Amino acid sequence: MATFDKAGICFALALGVLGARPTQGGPSSQTADPRKAMIAALASANPNPSLGDEARTFDRFVGTWDCDFSFHLDDGTVRHQRGEVLFGWILDGRAVQDIWITYPAYGRKDRAIGTSLRFFDTKLKQWRVIFVGPQFNYAVNTQGGLEGERIVLRGTDSDGLPLRWSFNEMKADSFVWRGEKSRDGGKTWKVEEEHHMKRRPGHRAASADGVP
């Protein structure tokens, strides 16, 4: 998910966003702390029925994942960091938001945190994804969807080079996220990030049609 000086990726909208109830129609949910009212109103328990089968593309990831993040540095070495990713439906189930967190390491005192917002564009017939990493002044747009047995998203990185993000080896309790960049207009691709995810025990969510 973009290489923030190769140190880490990630987001923040509070972990409570994943468990709140949807509020389609009527007043927004009331919370004891007004500072959390927006978070409560944002979350949805399920995808919106209008998405149909497209909901399955990212619904399979809803929940919390423990991550082994690996960053491929320019000198050929690979740096590993631990972290987590959280997926959940938002905006009346019309979009998915995910939080990417890498834990402090390599002398850093703060975690790295960023967010992706994913929604299905009914005109383009593709998923559009916006990723933001405020700590690194980073933002990027991609779009794509299912391609065979994986999810592929394409866009342009902040340095103007083509990038390709993909979800691979997708299983009920694991998947591999890969970030690649091309320096020859898409003829060849170099892996910059490869992150191995395992679902946290007890954090499995049934998919829209009951299939993991």
Locate the predicted segments by residue.
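Amphipathic/hydrophobic helical signal segments and adjacent flexible N-terminal regions
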Residues: 2-11, 17-78, 202-212
